[in-house]
Amino acid sequence: MKDAEIIEVLRRKVDVPVGRHLYGIIGSYDSLNRFSSELSKATRTDGSPFPQPISVNKGLLEFFSDTEFRTTVETEAKYPQPTRKKIEDAFDRFIRNHLKEYGLIILQDLELVFAYNVNLNPLRTLAADERKIILLLPGKRSDKTIIMYPHCTEGENPLPTNLIAEDHLWLLDV
């Protein structure tokens, strides 16, 4: 879809006060940057601007002190599950804090979340009623599956099925 068409649908959907509000925009890094720029110029139906996208990678790293981060990196290969749990907990706190403060958040740069296979299903519960999340996801559609980071050589990273409702998920034109 064209950027303007997606933005128009988002304008209507995010201002509905009840229901699930987890949205996904899928495209290349270039098309996501273009879309993000266009979305930042758009206003919601009440005239307020859409918020600027938030880098999840940067936000997660800020949850760790320098010492804790160094220890985590040094022990990651030996203890991958505790590292994954730390990232998952930091992601949960990050999302909850931003939703509480802003209500509507746009998330980009989710590479750490996918690299550590963080469970994304809590996003469905958190993004409801007055709390809304828009995910900017680098990926492509392959049959009925969304493949995240399709240029990654480490294998496929499918977006969990049923995470985002089909009518809340859009593929950007190139």
Language model features with spans:
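Glycine-rich P-loop/Walker A and Walker A-like loops and their local beta1-loop-alpha1 context
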Residues: 1-47, 118
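Residue-level preference for the first positions of well-ordered beta-strands
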Residues: 20-24, 104-106, 132-134
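Short acidic, S/G/P-rich loop/turn micro-motifs used as interaction or catalytic elements
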Residues: 30-33, 60-62, 110-116, 140-142
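Short amphipathic alpha-helical segments and helix-helix/interface helices
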Residues: 36, 40, 95-96, 120-127
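AAA+/P-loop NTPase substrate/partner-engagement loops
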Residues: 48-71
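Short glycine-rich substrate-engagement loop in P-loop NTPases that contacts/grips substrate
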Residues: 68-96
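Conserved P-loop NTPase "ATPase switch" module shared by AAA+ and STAND
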Residues: 99-117
